């Protein structure tokens, strides 16, 4: 899709826009001890006092636009793994030059590190690394319980015991749409 700007002010500060770009989350690994999928990458920009809402702790400066069309891509989520298969990687979301990476896939096969991405996938071995937070690692012995997927603000937890996987990491809360809403949490 596109975001079309058809007219702008002569004052550059008045052409500021807030944005939030959240990528697709990843699928969790298959089997009973698969790792959780990582959250899609989360990017938010705001310009005060033009857009005075309560932003997430990850907020940066918003964008200034000109009269043109800006490309927008909304990333899809990854499919869950079946049996012992890995989950699918999330797809990137893009607004203009701002890209949020898709979430890192949760692993199903024992001993395999979680996928890298916007937030790392939970591992059936080590947790995945990320643009945001990392995924948790599996419990190694005597059996493997997968790690949780990373969230926008908190990493996924490691597997807790042979039968309890790690919790997914917390997302980020923003009121960009007028209501405090948490987004981009990791899978457990």
Regions found by a protein language model. Name each.
Residues 1-188:
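Glycine-biased low-complexity/repetitive sequence motifs
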